[in-house]
Amino acid sequence: TKVNLGVGVYYDENGKLPLLDCVRQAEDQLNATHAPRGYLPIDGIPAYDQAVQKLLLGKDSPVIADKRAVTAQALGGTGGLKIGADLLRRFSPEGTTVYISNPSWENHRAIFEAAGFKVETYPYYDAATHGVNFQGMLDCIKAARPGSVFVLHACCHNPTGVDLDDAQWDQVLAALQSAGQVPFLDIAY
């Protein structure tokens, strides 16, 4: 059996990209409406944006209630990262460093370097334990220049699949805040 782990796309046992029944049904429903297909608003479908905010922040989040959350629908995960990287570059001081995990999805480096950032790595995977090098990660967050950006995989860390538990997330967020760092969450899955 061959397994292609290079791209986050599902292939069937014949190596073909299948049209899933749920996708076919959704397309049939859209086609049955005979509605015109215009451009979406610049920030995407408002109902989708609101649903994403509730999913990520909780439906009763004060951030949503106070209208402090901004959500924009993007073209795929890479498109969203590119928009975020460009936005950060525009508002970050010259010389700001972006830290990506070691190892990381290699597109992280390419996207942030293309936006004009210097990219470094923070310790993440511990090959000896097959877990997170948690102390190394915290030490890097604390030692980095304040205002540095830390790209964090919210779940399904790419490429290791090793995630932080809730208690570790609490410590990482406290360390980021205490050290004056900027978290940048990649929620790919």
Write out the residue ranges for each language-model feature:
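Conserved N-terminal helix/loop that builds the PLP phosphate-binding region
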Residues: 1-28
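Active-site-proximal loop/turn and secondary-structure-junction residues that shape catalytic pockets
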Residues: 9-11, 104, 156, 189
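Conserved core of the PLP fold type I
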Residues: 24, 28-29, 34-182
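Hydrophobic, well-ordered secondary-structure scaffolds
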Residues: 176, 188-189
